[in-house]
């Protein structure tokens, strides 16, 4: 039951990100060039930029950020960006080399280091450890890929799954874009406030649904 409940709650956050991206109005004329690595972050930034412009997504389709290789066109887009937003060079290894060689004009936002982002430890030991050892052979490949989702200090890289972290992601992105384009600062502030209100509502909903099982251990995989 715990696993099913957690899957349902995580699906709420995923649904929020999808709905956030849909039907976003665009501003006529030239807009800030904002490039984002992965879909969950892109969805949040797209809503933040509603009425201003549309951020460009790098890892599209079913591609994995762990194995993604930059094409000349995507490398060029990052080099020509005003703001480049990523989670971390561990979650997105393809960003390591290009970030070190970007022009100084490109503002790089590494979200795992953003103010207000809470990092959660990689799950291990106890119930989770027993679960892993019981499925070692069947899930060896899956666990190997999962390991790439964690930073070197053992922290989980899926920072956007926590609504509080999602607010911090939006705040860091808004700050970077507004610094480059102060003429959009007020619109960004308005959009950020609207996103925060929705995320607060989602956080309350999740807390309410989790209340009956808050003291029970459960596994997410």
Regions found by a protein language model. Name each.
Residues 12, 27-221:
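Extracytoplasmic metal-acquisition and chelation regions
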Residues 7, 21-24, 111:
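N-terminal compositionally biased, intrinsically disordered segments and leader/signal-like regions
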């Amino acid at each position: 039951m715990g696993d099913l409940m957690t899957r349902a709650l995580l699906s709420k956050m995923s649904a929020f990100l999808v709905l956030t991206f849909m039907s976003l109005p665009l501003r006529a004329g030239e807009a800030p060039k904002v490039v984002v690595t992965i879909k969950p972050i892109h969805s949040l930034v797209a809503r933040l930029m509603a009425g201003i412009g549309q951020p460009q997504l790098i890892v599209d389709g079913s591609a994995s950020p762990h194995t993604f290789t930059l094409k000349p066109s995507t490398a060029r887009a990052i080099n020509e960006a005003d703001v480049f937003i990523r989670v971390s060079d561990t979650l997105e290894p393809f960003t390591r080399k290009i970030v070190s060689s970007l022009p100084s004009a490109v503002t790089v936002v590494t979200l795992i280091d953003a103010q207000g982002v809470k990092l959660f430890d990689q799950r291990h030991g106890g119930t989770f450890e027993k679960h892993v050892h019981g499925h070692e052979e069947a899930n060896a490949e899956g666990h190997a890929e999962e390991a790439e989702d964690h930073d070197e200090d053992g922290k989980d890289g899926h920072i956007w799954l926590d609504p509080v972290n999602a607010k911090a992601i939006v705040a860091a992105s808004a700050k970077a874009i507004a610094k480059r384009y102060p003429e959009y600062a007020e619109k960004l502030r308005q959009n950020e406030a609207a996103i925060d209100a929705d995320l607060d509502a989602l956080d309350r909903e999740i807390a309410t649904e989790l209340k009956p099982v808050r003291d029970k251990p459960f596994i997410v995989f």
